[in-house]
Each structure stands twice: as C-alpha cells, then as structure tokens.
C-alpha cells in the first residue's frame, strides 16, 4: 500500500505489470510503517505501508526567498534521459513548492540484440501550497502524472509450441529484430493520474490535534494490443476511468503517563470505475460503484525499553457491480454486495 502525501494511491493495480502512478522524485521523505500502526490505513495495509511525503514548506521567512534544485540523469541501456526540478518559496505564513519530472527512453537491449518496443515516456507536475497560523495550518496539493510504456513484441506468445521453439532457439528470430528506436507502438500501456488534496490541521492545545483531509483522484488507464485489423490496434482493448473521493478525520493526543499517544479517526471513501465503450473487447474489470466507511483506534505506550501498540478498526463497504460477460452473447449482470470487517492488532 502506498500513501502519496497523505493520500492513499488508488489506481488499476490489478495487473502485475502496472507500476504505481506517482513521481518518486518529488518525495523528500520515505517511511515504511508496519505492525499495529497499519490499522489506520484500512484494507490492504496489514503487510505494511510506504509513506511518501514532501518536506515541510518554508514558512516564517521574513523576506521572500527562492530555493530550487535540478537533477539530470542518463540511462546507457535504453539511451534514456531524465530530468527533475523543484522550486520553492516562503514568506511569513505562506509557503509554495513546485515540482516537475520528465523521462524518455528507447528500446532496451541485451548483449546481442535489441528488445524492440520497450521504450517509455513519463511526465509529471505537482504543486504544494500552504498557510500556517498559530492554531491552524491549511495546505493544498495537486499533481498530474502521465506515462506510456511499450511492451516487447516477442513477449506475445500465441501457444505453448511457439514458446518451446523460442526457448530452443535461445533468442528472437533475427529477421524480426529491428534497429533501436524511441517510437512506442502497440502493444503498449498508458495511464494518467490526477490527485487533488486539501488538508486542515487544528491545534486544540499542545497535546491534542484535529486533522481534516479531503481528496480526489482520477485514474485513466488504456491498454493497446496488436489486433488482426491494423486500424483497430490504436483502439484500446481496455479503457478504464477510476475516480475516488475521500474524506478523513483524525484526532491525535499525547499523554504524559508512559509516553502514551492515541489516534482515533473516521474515513469515508466513494469510488466509481467506468469502462469507456468502443474497445470491441469485454471489460476486464466491470463497472462498479463502492462506498466504504471505517473507524479506527490506535494507542501506543512505552514501558522502559518495551514499546506496546494496540489497534482496532471496523470497516463497512457497499459495492454495486454491473457489465456484460462477453461480446458474443451480451449477457448482462448486475450485483449488489455488502461487506463488513473488524480488525485488531497488538504489537510489542
């Protein structure tokens, strides 16, 4: 499970070849969370959570100051190049940070031949703005991430006999290997991910805080294949739009006794998945709408060298699914499901 600047990444992650749609070059702090603390992040988090966050904004500058950095890289294998840059400024109670990233690469190669159609192209922009008062801190975060990655031509095997022949030969047929290129043709995948987040932190007193977070994500994924009709190859076989709306409330407290801390929160998520028509293929993931609500409690204490944590969480999920089973018989299905789950974790 990945958390990008406090927002749970929601994308079409059902494929083993689906890389997370986020710009790691824009994260200044990376943390791995395990144990009872994972209880706050809901389903899919019990194995651990990776937190990617920006550094704090430069508040409290008496004069306007501008800082920045640029990073440039080159990949000899794919003749790929990459660049990223950050610029930030702050003045009194206000802070602003802008970040951008671009990468482009061509065909990868082994020692003996080129792996055609394995190029990649990625571009990302993000902005973080904030205001900090005595008791309140408000931040706005937005990002857009786009990537296109080619799929190796020879990886498409039609049957077992063809696979065995490929193993026996030990390499692709030399007549099918083409010169190096940056061009990406079907089969390939492309995706676009948009994130918007608003957060308000309220300091009730030095030991008690309230956090309110509202976020929206839009994930568009398209997958293209080589089809029998060439003109259809540029029509995606999968064309999915996933939208996620989320609202979280968190109360945090510190206690003097045994260095105890308490976190209690509520989370609400509404999500829709829509398959755009015209792909001429059955949808791999059906259309659905899901409403999830949950509440959790996390308490930690220290007894000398011994650290203990107790976490409890209850989740409720409503799911409505509909679609067609195939293009041949157009069998329509419509289903409605209710799920609930209670989780408790104790760690020392």
Question: What does each model-found stretch correspond to?
Answer:
Residues 1-348:
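Outer-membrane beta-barrel proteins, especially TonB-dependent receptors
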């Amino acid at each position: 499970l990945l958390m990008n600047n406090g927002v749970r990444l929601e994308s079409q992650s059902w494929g083993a070849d689906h890389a997370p749609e986020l710009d790691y070059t824009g994260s200044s702090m990376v943390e791995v969370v395990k144990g009872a603390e994972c209880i706050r992040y809901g389903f899919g988090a019990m194995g651990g959570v990776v937190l990617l966050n920006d550094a704090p904004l430069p508040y409290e500058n008496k004069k306007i100051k501008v800082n920045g950095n640029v990073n440039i890289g080159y990949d000899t294998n794919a003749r790929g190049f990459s660049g990223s840059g950050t610029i930030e400024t702050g003045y009194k109670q206000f802070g602003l940070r802008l970040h951008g990233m671009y990468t482009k690469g061509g065909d990868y190669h082994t020692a003996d031949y080129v792996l055609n159609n394995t190029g990649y192209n990625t571009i990302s922009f993000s902005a973080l703005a904030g205001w900090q008062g005595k008791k309140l801190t408000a931040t706005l975060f937005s990002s857009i991430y786009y990537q296109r990655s080619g799929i190796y031509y020879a990886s498409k095997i039609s049957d077992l006999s063809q696979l065995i022949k490929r193993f026996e030969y030990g390499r692709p047929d030399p007549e099918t290997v083409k010169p190096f290129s940056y061009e990406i043709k079907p089969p390939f995948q492309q995706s676009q991910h948009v994130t918007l987040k608003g957060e308000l932190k309220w300091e009730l007193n030095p030991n008690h805080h309230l956090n309110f977070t509202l976020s929206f994500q839009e994930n568009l994924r398209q997958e293209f294949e080589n089809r029998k009709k060439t003109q259809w190859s540029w029509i995606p076989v999968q064309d999915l739009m996933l939208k996620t709306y989320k609202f979280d409330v968190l109360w945090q407290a510190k206690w003097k006794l045994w260095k105890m801390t308490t976190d209690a929160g509520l989370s609400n998520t509404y999500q829709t998945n829509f398959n755009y028509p015209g792909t001429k293929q059955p949808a791999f993931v059906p259309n659905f709408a899901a409403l999830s609500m949950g509440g959790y409690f996390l308490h930690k204490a220290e007894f000398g060298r011994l650290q203990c944590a107790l976490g409890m969480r209850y989740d409720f999920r409503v799911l409505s699914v509909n679609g067609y089973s195939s293009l041949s018989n157009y069998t329509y299905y419509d289903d409605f499901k209710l799920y609930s789950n209670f989780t408790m974790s104790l760690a020392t």
